[in-house]
Amino acid sequence: MLHRAAQLLEAEFGPQWRTVADMLGTEGLRKRVGKELTSFMAYPERGAGGNSQWRGNCSPEVVAALLRYCLDDKRYYGKDTSTFTLLDPMSGSGTSKAAADRYQVRSLLYDLNPAPAYGKGNWNALKDEVEDSADLIFFHPPYHNMIQYSGNIWGTPHPDDLSRCENYSDFLEKLNHCIRKFFLALRKGGRLAILVGDMRLHGKFYSMQNDLMRMGDFESFLVKGQFNCVSDNRTYKKPFIPIVTEYA
């Protein structure tokens, strides 16, 4: 039955049939009780915004869903949203800007890259102070050294690049330093959304979401499905459990 369904979808939608199948297969989890944001996020179709070729970036729909939730919550309780501000302190290719522009809210984008696509460059999350406050801070750090950014994706190697930490303990210490700094930059009633994943390094499993610092009230735990990963087209003989989720 599934093989026949796949044939029908491919005949109707061509190369996009897998994306259509993924969207249909996850819809029952993505939408419940009239809500567009549930504890399961899945965006097989990435959407427009940022640079899809920038390794490790997330779908702008992730940021948009979190932003929409925060705006809806403020409006429900009769709070003003005219000065709502979204801050992304590791903005990469500028994905968060696309989400902010969609909802016509102010966005602040920082990045260690001296020449980012948008926002303030050469901003060091370990040493520089956050120059403003925000209602929503979306923090999507490197997953340790899975993808090294400085000297690879941009510029030259930087000693304060979290993707170039010597080991996981060093990475976690610096990650938690950033979390503390960003939490203190929140406005009253603000939210810090952290998107992280799990990884295997030299055969050992590391869970960032389990190890990172938690500050304030823990509002929700969201599981996000991963799609269109570089490793999707590889096969491995050794038995292991593939990592196909991230967490916010």
Kindly give the residue locations of the regions a language model identified.
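Class I S-adenosyl-L-methionine-dependent methyltransferase catalytic core
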Residues: 1-248
